[in-house]
Amino acid sequence: MKKIPFITLDKAKEIIAEIPTPFHLYDEAGIRRNARALKAAFAWNKGFKEFFAVKATPNPYILKILHEEGCGCDCATYTELLLSEAVGITGHDVIFSSNDTPALDMRKARDMGVYINLDDATYVDFLASMGPVPETVCLRYNPGGSFSLGNTIMDMPRDAKYGMTEDQMAGAITRLMKLGTKHFGVHAFLASNTTTNEYYPALAGQLFRLAVRLRNATGAHISFIDLSGGIGVDYRPEQPRCDIGVIGEGVRVKYEEILTPNDMGDVAIFTELGRFMLAPYGHLISTVIHEKHIYREYVGLDACAANLMRPAMYGAYHHITVLGKEDAILDHVYDVTGGLCENNDKFAIERSLPEIQIGDIVAIHDTGAHGFSMGYNYNGKLRSAEVLLKEDGSFQLIRRAETPEDYFATFDFSDFHFGK
């Protein structure tokens, strides 16, 4: 399927006239449309809630849009909790899923009254040492072994640092009940960026059966089951696209097959999607500033891996559109590069693209999640701006670009003078 950018060349030029490239651009209309589709897919479950994975796109304007569409926040750190709180998202609109958790983070989660998802059985006493335990606590499960769909191994939970065994969960529940906890959640994350409609239903079936066993073993009330994230996006044009309606129906079938007959038809379903919620609705907009002709043809951008780490770090594919040349013949082959002093600073390697000239504007697709958030300052590069393309066609700067003053700010105790 052809990937079409959500912005035209004319609109890009309008924004660039005020906000220089590179910048991350987000599509408000697409974000809202997708959030509503998710909600509709799970409308059969009275308690359903999406807790957006803040790590994917930690911007308060994005969190506010999602909150207006009924989403909460999935936070993993003290800072993410602060960000959520600043937007007015707190209490049971937040789930705190952390690991190797500092005391400061756990205390903040307790103070905010959020759902706390314990990664390890030893955290029961850690939590209790801070005061009365919450009435509702979630526990993260690791089944070990491999996680497969049919004959395909999707991931290896036995190698993951997250979660606890079933026996540890049962022991933690028993201990928490003695301490005063009345309701429990069950959580697991077993695969990342899946592009099959079968992942969530398969995971749901596994967690639903686990919940029944835990209820039978401990007498605990399981109030929600958290499917976490893992639904991916079609980064490549030829990849299949997940159908959230089909996924929601698949989970419903498992729910009625396993939970309802076991008198657990009141269990709420939670999700913690990040990539699925935002990735397709973000572009990294950049200007071509250089071309080089040696053993390969190179096109250099004013963006680099510090703006989008995934291609350099994972070898990940991100589609590239040269704005204004969407229908041009792809008769040139380029490496598309950034300016870091690292040879892996390449957005594309031997990619077929239309002929490119210096000054062309490119849109790098699917950067709405794990794009800006994974940025860094290597080589003294400064993080880019973030811009929201609003539903009415206007645009808003929602994070300014870093300046050299920002970069040097943490040296404020020193005797050095940093000029502009």
Name each region found by the language model.
Residues M1-I116, A121-S129, V133-E135, A170, ...:
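A charged N-terminal "starter" segment
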Residues I31, K55, T77, A109, ...:
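Conserved, mostly hydrophobic/aromatic
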Residues P58-Y61, L83, D125, S146-F147, ...:
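Flexible loop/turn segments at secondary-structure boundaries
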Residues G72, I95, N117, C138-R140, ...:
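Structured core elements
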Residues P132-S146:
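Glycine-rich, aromatic-flanked loop segments that form ligand/cofactor-binding clefts
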Residues P143-I289:
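Active-site loop/helix belt of alpha/beta enzymes
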Residues M264-K420:
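Charged (often Lys/Glu-rich) extended helix/loop segments that serve as interaction or gating elements
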